Every structure is written in structure tokens, then in C-alpha cells.
């Protein structure tokens, strides 16, 4: 007696279902998450206008706006194309690249916008810059924790290099502030790992549901074909 093997369809595979859910959540919230850095950059530029290097500030603001336009163009192309098994990895990598570049832009802000000069309150102005960056990272963690690599690609360049830079400056307050930023980065990493495990659990449950549905549909088809052969 011949056995019947029911292979899962590509759209029901575990890897595809996981990536598809991640992409859907990342891009569905991107309309708002892509806008926040622009608003934050404008507020920061207004506050730092009197103390920042003007040339650096102009270039940095230009990069923020250009990057936002590029991300919204990416979002528009995504909605025009959609997700399929053959392009899911591409859309995830594109989003990964966009958040990494955003993290670099904000990490640079904490190192070059405010001059380390005794004539200005460097710790105050740079502290506000890092406070805004930490706020953006913590807000993004809610969306980006579904994929640990996406969160790391954004948070690491945004927080770790400026934290190391503050420690490297050597004075008591800035070094302590840099250490607290690294501690904060550790805390959000632990929280993100827990959120990611919960997400993977729900994806596993959804995958099992889809596999059962797929096998049931295939069995119905096999049963229907078998009845047709009996009637012949």
C-alpha cells in the first residue's frame, strides 16, 4: 500500500512564517516610527543652535531628512510589492539597513554636534542629546524587539560608540554618564530578549495552526480524488 506524504507548502514553513510576521509588524508601524527621529532632530537642532558646530548641524539635519525620505520611499515600495517567500529576506535586509543607518546618524550626534569646550556646559547639552537618543531607542524597542538583529542594528551604533566616547573623555561626570548609558543598553537588551522569546512562542503557535489547516486541506483533496476514482 502506497503511503501519502503531505509536504508543507512554502508559505507554511517555519522560517517564512517567522520572517513574514516580523516584516509585517516592522513595516506596519514604520509610518510612525520613521517620523519620530525627524521631529526629535528638529527639536534637538533648535536647542543646540547656539552651541553646536553649525556646519556639522546642517549636515546632520540634512542626513536626517534625506534618510527619512529614503525610508518612506522604501515603505511605499513595500506596500506596492507585498511579502512572498522569494522576497521576504530582501525586505527584512532592507529594513535592517535602514535602522542601522539611522542608528549611526544618532550615534554621531552624541559625538560631534556639541564641542567639548569648557566655555559651554558640555555635559548638559550633550546629555540632552543622549537623552533624546535613548528615548528613541526605548520607543523603537517595542517594535524592533520582534527581531533581535534589527534592534541591535539600531541601538548599538546609536548608544555604544557615544557612551565609549564619553568614558574616553576622562572627566568624572561624562565618564559616569557613559557608564550609565552602557548599563541602560544592557537593560533594554535583556528586556528585548524576553519580548523576542514571547513573540517566537506565538509564531510557533500560529505555525502549528497553519500546518494543521494545510494538512486538513490536503487530506480533503486526497479524499475527494479517492472518491472520484471509486466512482469510475
Listing of model-derived features with the role each one plays in the protein:
Residues 1-14:
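Short, charged cytosolic
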Amino acid at each position: 500500500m502506497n503511503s501519502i506524504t503531505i509536504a508543507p507548502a512554502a508559505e507554511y514553513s517555519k522560517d517564512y512564517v517567522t520572517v513574514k510576521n516580523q516584516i509585517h509588524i516592522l513595516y506596519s508601524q514604520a509610518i510612525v516610527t520613521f517620523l519620530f527621529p525627524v521631529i526629535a532632530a528638529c527639536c534637538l537642532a533648535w536647542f543646540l543652535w547656539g552651541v553646536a558646530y553649525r556646519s556639522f548641524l546642517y549636515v546632520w539635519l540634512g542626513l536626517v531628512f534625506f534618510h527619512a525620505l529614503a525610508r518612506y520611499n522604501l515603505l511605499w515600495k513595500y506596500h506596492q510589492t507585498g511579502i512572498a517567500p522569494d522576497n521576504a529576506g530582501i525586505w527584512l535586509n532592507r529594513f535592517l539597513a535602514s535602522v542601522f543607518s539611522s542608528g549611526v546618524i544618532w550615534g554621531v550626534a552624541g559625538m560631534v554636534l556639541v564641542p567639548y569646550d569648557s566655555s559651554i556646559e558640555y555635559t548638559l547639552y550633550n546629555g540632552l542629546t543622549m537623552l533624546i537618543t535613548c528615548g528613541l531607542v526605548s520607543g523603537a524597542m517595542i517594535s524592533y524587539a520582534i527581531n533581535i538583529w534589527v534592534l541591535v542594528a539600531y541601538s548599538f551604533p546609536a548608544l555604544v560608540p557615544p557612551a565609549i566616547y564619553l568614558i574616553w573623555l576622562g572627566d568624572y561626570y561624562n565618564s559616569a554618564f557613559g557608564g550609565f548609558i552602557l548599563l541602560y543598553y544592557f537593560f533594554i537588551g535583556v528586556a528585548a530578549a524576553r519580548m523576542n522569546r514571547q513573540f517566537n512562542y506565538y509564531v510557533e503557535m500560529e505555525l502549528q495552526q497553519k500546518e494543521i489547516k494545510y494538512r486538513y486541506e490536503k487530506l480533503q483533496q486526497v479524499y475527494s480524488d479517492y472518491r472520484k476514482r471509486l466512482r469510475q
